[in-house]
């Protein structure tokens, strides 16, 4: 038993009884657990010595079973798009990549039933608190996955309606959010919240759509604003605030962590760099430092993970399951791409590089990714059509 401080008020809606705490019917808790299991799977699968308790298969199976259990044990709220719900797409992709087809088929059928329901609704953005831009992320991802293009377009339009781009750190890519301070803030009131987790989560579908429409720089600006907004509420000592108070009389973070974890999830899973050529602005780097020469342009990555880069002139999306990209270079004439990988570490002796089918490397393939032995010094890969 844990002794609770008797000086606190334990009679509010936020204080749950044992019976309420044991209730499995709140679907919004399931993506957190599924994501945790999925991360353990990927750490065990692609790195050495990080995860020792169970084999990687156990964690991927648990992630999938948790995802399915959400619809069985929490069917009411599972009808809505979930915060962090795009992790279910990632879990499904990995199940198929690993050949766990029976479990993958079951998860796919479960999620398609939800997407079928959304396809019949004009604006399927309900939620526990449906006014707060929480359902769009997963609704877009599954609508896009299952080919409900019109519904994906409606969802993206809704996101862009409340996620602006402007030259201001607080409002660029800031998704609509007003009410969570009232219920979960140290300073409790209704106000425009700066970079609540709506920013980090809604950036996921925006950047996903940008990679499908790489001529639309507006999408990149909005999506990257939301992506970086997700880390703007981390203090120097590492505290993650739910959001920043926008009232001119305050202008400071809220001193409760609230739901910050979902924002950090949005940054972690969506962290990526973009090398872009724009007709008006020339070459640009999002998530990196740019150096341009006569025949080439180079971007040194500055993102946290350094495991994803998009070369916009080629619409080339490169992701790593392990390892890190130090820089990417693009030859303007030959369209050749050079990818410099960071040296090996004790836990990461190999890089696992995912490329489109039209690009091939002379390395072994493991579940669709090129397994590349890293060295004590950086190595460079040359990518050609």
Regions found by a protein language model. Name each.
Residues 1-384:
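Catalytic domains of carbohydrate-active enzymes that cleave complex glycans
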């Amino acid at each position: 038993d844990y002794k609770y401080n008797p000086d606190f008020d334990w009679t509010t809606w936020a204080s749950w009884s044992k019976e309420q705490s044991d209730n499995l019917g709140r679907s919004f808790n399931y993506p957190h657990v599924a994501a945790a299991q999925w991360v353990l799977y990927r750490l065990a699968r692609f790195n050495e010595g990080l995860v020792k308790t169970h084999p990687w298969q156990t964690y991927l199976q648990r992630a999938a079973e948790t995802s399915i259990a959400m619809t069985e044990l929490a069917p009411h709220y599972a009808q809505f798009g979930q915060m962090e719900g795009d992790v279910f797409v990632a879990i499904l992709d990995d199940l198929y990549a690993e050949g766990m087809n029976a479990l993958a088929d079951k998860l796919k059928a479960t999620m398609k039933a939800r997407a079928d329901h959304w396809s019949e609704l004009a604006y399927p953005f309900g939620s526990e608190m449906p006014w707060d831009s929480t359902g769009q992320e997963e609704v877009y991802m599954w609508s896009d996955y299952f080919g409900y293009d019109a519904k994906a377009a409606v969802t993206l339009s809704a996101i862009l309606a409340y996620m602006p781009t402007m030259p201001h750190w607080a409002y660029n890519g800031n998704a609509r959010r007003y009410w969570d301070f009232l219920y979960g803030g140290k300073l409790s009131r209704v106000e425009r919240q700066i970079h609540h987790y709506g920013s980090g989560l809604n950036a996921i579908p925006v950047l996903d759509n940008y990679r499908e429409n790489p001529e639309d720089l507006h999408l990149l600006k909005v999506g990257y604003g939301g992506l970086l907004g997700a880390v703007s509420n981390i203090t120097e000592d590492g505290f993650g605030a739910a959001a920043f108070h926008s009232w001119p009389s305050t202008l400071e973070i809220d001193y409760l962590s609230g739901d910050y974890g979902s924002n950090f999830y949005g940054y972690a899973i969506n962290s990526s760099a973009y090398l872009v050529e724009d007709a008006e602005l020339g070459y640009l780097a999002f998530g990196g430092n740019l150096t341009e020469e006569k025949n080439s342009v180079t971007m040194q990555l500055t993102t946290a993970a350094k495991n994803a880069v998009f070369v916009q002139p080629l619409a080339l999306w490169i992701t790593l399951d392990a390892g890190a990209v130090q820089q990417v270079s693009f030859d303007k004439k030959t369209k050749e791409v050079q990818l410099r990988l960071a040296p090996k570490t004790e836990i990461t002796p190999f890089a696992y590089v995912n490329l489109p089918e039209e690009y091939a490397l002379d390395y072994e393939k493991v579940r669709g990714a090129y397994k590349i032995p890293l060295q004590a010094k950086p190595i460079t890969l040359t990518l050609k059509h």
